[in-house]
UniProtKB/Swiss-Prot annotation:
Coiled coil: none annotated. Belongs to the jasmonate-induced protein family. It comes from the Eukaryota. This is Jasmonate-induced protein homolog. The lineage of its organism: Eukaryota, Viridiplantae, Streptophyta, Embryophyta, Tracheophyta. InterPro entries: Jasmonate-induced_protein, Nakanori. It comes from Atriplex canescens.
Amino acid sequence: MASTQAMGMTEQQKKSVDEMVEKATNMGVNVQAQNSAVVSMINQTNVSMTFNENHNWSGSVVGTGYPKSIPTKQSRQFIHQGDAKDGSQGAVVYYGSNANGEPCGWLLAWCAPTNVTPTKPNRVYVDCGAQSKFDTISWDTIKAKLDVGPATTNFTDVDTETTIAAGVTSTGSFASVGAAFGLST
């Protein structure tokens, strides 16, 4: 199975991620989020995506929980409240399908430490591809990749022609995470 970690985001991916980070920032300010990651995701595929699973290394979702679905061409948000020691560290997986109707999955993981430092920065990790790839997830492997991840990244699975891009930034007392789930065609 071929896949590629892209060298850089396309202009469209960067624009989408920036818009989602801004949406997360506005939501965080409005609800006065503290020690949290405010996550905003947009579905740029041609079908609705459904929530499959989540994993929490530190913290938990608050409020209405994870969005059960993300309709096509729309965005959804949630707040992941961090704990005082390690901040907000979690992941979500959404299922949908690619342009050929094949079942696919998109994974977004984030790390928003309580006290961001040069040695403990905000990080994101993303993955996508055939749905079967996400049937059994090694969360230890995802965490190891997240622990060395950058603040912005993107990934394309060439077999399924799916793509995902994400970014995280500190916004005072919380982190804003933006992600775009899409197709590479």
